[in-house]
Amino acid sequence: MKVVKTASAGTLESNDVLVTVEPGEGIKLDIESVVYQQFGQAIRATVMDTLAALDVTDATLHLNDRGALDCTIAARVETAARRAGEGV
């Protein structure tokens, strides 16, 4: 899927994550999380797996995590990517 515009999904509420996807070259992740020290690698892996499943290869993502579960992170990334993309 090609990312053609900026789109977001999620909230800044506790146990949620706000994901913003915008066009870019390669995959660039900017992760801000209250649990980054403990779960940063798991968050990054969940995002990369979700993008791979959607065939997204060029995008910049900004995540503002408030302790979201992996399933929530995956759902927010997928929703934001589909909103930003073409060829869904």
Task: Please identify what each model-predicted range represents.
Residues 1-88:
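N-terminal intrinsically disordered, cationic/polar leader segments
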